[in-house]
A protein has these predicted regions:
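Long, low-complexity intrinsically disordered regions
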Residues: 6-252
Length: 252
């Protein structure tokens, strides 16, 4: 069962060939400008692995006229987009970014951690844009254990956490390293159900057509995109199955 697929309503029967044609036509749209492609996709996954190519370059090469590897990062400061976590890490439209914030992280920071964050935030606001080295030099936070069991600069880890919580935004990159600026906050979406439906629609725009199981898993991944609404995911998934078209493909 694919959800959604083609223009058929719920549980229509379609052939595998028809689904393939639809999938190709839907995702490989006519090459356009970089801003329009990002707006259409809503989200572009980022991955630093360069073999065979980085994920963002593989995605955009066939969807942007005259695209060259690295164009996204080079033009990022002027594109009006953000680096952020959606169902995984990547580049998101400003509209999607606003939907996910203000974000309440599941990992609760103690008062001492927040005090450090506010000191760094004041420093960033004073400087405008900062490289992690500048923060480390200013505050000398030392080292911390990273996700892989190794050692990382504690300042870098703090900046990552501040970025995820919406205190900072990525202003640009220098040699692949994120440089940060302060991010101005805004009010939370007044209608949680509508906001969750909009997040689900970004998943559909990016990944459909796809099997119901895969679709359901991606909706559950919204726990990282909007942890403050993690309890609203099941209801959003149920609404999506009611409002989005689906199909049985070759009897499956």
């Amino acid at each position: 069962q694919a959800c959604p697929a083609l223009s058929h309503r719920h549980m229509s029967a379609v052939t595998l060939d028809a689904l393939r044609r639809h999938a190709v036509a839907r995702t490989l749209f006519k090459p356009t400008t970089l801003p329009k492609a990002i707006d259409k996709l809503g989200f572009v996954q980022a991955d630093p692995i360069r073999a065979p190519a980085r994920a963002q370059d593989l995605t955009l090469r066939h969807r942007v006229r005259d695209y060259r590897a690295g164009d996204l990062e080079a033009r990022y400061p002027k594109l009006g987009i953000e680096e952020d976590f959606f169902v995984n890490y990547g580049f998101v439209s400003r509209e999607l970014h606003r939907l996910m914030h203000p974000r309440t992280a599941r990992a609760v920071w103690p008062k001492s951690r927040w005090a450090m964050a506010h000191e760094v935030l004041a420093f960033v606001r004073e400087r405008g844009v900062v490289h992690p080295r500048e923060v480390d030099r200013q505050f000398q936070h030392g080292k911390s254990r990273n996700w892989f069991g190794g050692s990382s600069n504690a300042s870098t880890e703090l900046l990552d956490g501040m970025h995820y919580r919406g205190l900072l935004r990525v202003a640009r990159r220098e040699g692949g390293t994120r440089c940060y600026a302060a991010r101005e906050g805004h009010e939370a979406a007044p209608d949680v159900a509508a906001a969750m439906d909009a997040l689900v629609d970004v998943i559909v725009a990016k990944y459909a057509p796809l099997p119901v199981a895969s679709f359901s898993q991606l909706v559950m991944f919204l726990a990282a995109a909007a942890p403050q609404w993690r309890d609203a995911r099941k209801a959003a998934l149920a609404r999506a199955k009611q409002r989005l078209p689906s199909a049985v493909v070759d009897g499956v």
